[in-house]
Amino acid sequence: MTTVYLADLRHNYSGVLGNDCVPLSVAYIKAVMDRDLPEVESRVFAYPDRLEQAMHEQPPDVLMVGNYCWNQALGDRFARLAKQLRPQSTVVQGGPNISLEPERRIAYLAEHPALDVYVLGEADFTAPDLVRRLLEVDGSVERLGELDIPSCIYRRPDGTIAYQPEVRRTRALDDIPSPWLTGVLDEFFDGKLAPLVETNRGCPFTCTFCVQGTSYYDKVRYFSEERVREEFTYIARRIKDRCPSMGTLRIADPNYGMYQRDTDLSGHLGALQKEYGWPTFIDATTGKNRPERVIASVEKSSGAMVLYHAVQSLDEDVLRNIKRQNIKLAAYEQLRIHMRGRGLRSMSQLILALPGETRASHFAALRKLVDAGINKLQNFQLMLLKGTELETLDTRRTFTFTSKYRVLPKTFGIYGDEKVFDIEEVVVSTDT
């Protein structure tokens, strides 16, 4: 039987986790494989030590590792290990942490010789299809390279690199079996990793600093409301039985609360709170449109969720530069007054060093938000996330970005005898 290891790793050094969410992305892939590829035995990994042990005990035929800003170097380390332990294995990487520009994407694979394939875009079906194609060529990565593989970057037998751009997202999300309801994620009710749920995918906004601001994600698609309710209930029951101290629920949507069904889902969470005492904290990025719906969602969560209104900047020129529109501050102040009167909490966020921002305009925004009575204000430095328009070479040149690198908080560790660090690129100056 073909073995596939699916790893969405988080640094775990001295018990400190670099990411405290369950590995939902690769769990989707396993759920599809379990249904569609019965001849494949797949396992999901979140913790590096467990993956290391499994790879030494039984090196997989295929290793698939997720690539995010918090685990790229960590994934690279295990890609190299896979080739050391079993040179004929196929090593696949996927995830949003890769540049938008085709030339830089091709260069990425060239710079990482342990990788055979990079999956672009959503991998729920692309990754299982890749394994299916591999089975058809008897597991030969060389013969795999002779095929035309959509949404992938991969090596041809002659050493050249093939590039097939992402195909448009078209399949219904409910075609993906739920990794919660199928039990794929049951082993991660361990009291360390918080449950993570998607109710939809995609974003109607075009913010250039965000991966979901790109055209690939411009259509919002939904998991059925019935399925999401069942997932919430499934999680609540197991949290109560297995790890009652875990009070957190993380919702992965980019604009939770903006749609009418979100209000209904929050009502269901409120009912679960009464029955199971969970969740006590809902970590969700609330939408910046339809504030009346967002407020209703916050209210129905019995105080477990805050109104998260990340303005990023209050300067109109900056907002145009990053293709973003904010709710007017006066309207936001009215929302805040309404929420405070009901005992609800609010939080906002600014980003330092956005294109066009000046020291004066940034300080002015800080003062306005403080004066508006925000309960909590976060001030971040602009990170050049791979996969965003802001990170492209053209944008860098347009706004004369000067950037530097630093280790991301909690994203380092020692694995075997190797020290591994994951870093971020931040902007330290612009032309303003």
Enumerate the predicted regions with their spans.
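N-terminal [4Fe-4S]-dependent radical SAM core
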Residues: 1-5, 11-12, 149, 153-196
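A structural motif corresponding to the C-terminal lobe/cap of the Radical SAM core domain
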Residues: 2, 60, 222, 271-432
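Short beta-strand segments
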Residues: 5-8, 44, 64-69, 93-94, ...
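Conserved N-terminal glycine/acidic-rich loop preference
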Residues: 7, 11, 20, 59-70, ...
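Glycine- and acidic-residue-enriched helix-capping/strand-helix junction motifs
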Residues: 13-26
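A general structural detector for well-ordered alpha-helical segments in enzyme core domains, enriched
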Residues: 29, 51, 74, 78-82, ...
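Glycine-rich beta-alpha loop elements in corrinoid/cobalamin-binding modules
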Residues: 32-166
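Radical SAM [4Fe-4S] cluster-binding motif and immediate context
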Residues: 174-341
